[in-house]
């Protein structure tokens, strides 16, 4: 894997890499939503194992996109970057959720990890750090807040489904997750992102 210094990326490269990351994660979470629907509707029993594996893959892949592509000496700087710190926490939480879903057979408490992670990620999107011009940051913040609210709704629905065993909720939360996945796939960093300054509104 070719490595690049974290600080060497141009704004254009950072926008391109960010867009790619959003698309890849969106496609993976979209696949999770589809597989969860196949499980909940009884179409494919094997999907019950497949979608937790995909959650784990999504978390690990995001960590790979953030860290191993850069020299180990750059990792502390990556962690100190507020936006990348949030991405790191999200990625680790997603990976943990994948493992927890695979362990659900050991106890029902594991079933609350994935919805908890969706709530965590949704909350982090509401306060997501953005780099760039004021106009670019404001636009990105607005898009991430909508995404965050969608993730929170999906998490609440999944938690309610785990607690009640409701069949309608088992169908509803993957649909909301698909809406969040679509937002990720369609997201593009606005012009001016990563150009100057940083912050959120």
Language model regions located:
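Peripheral, non-catalytic segments of secretory and membrane proteins
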Residues: 1-201
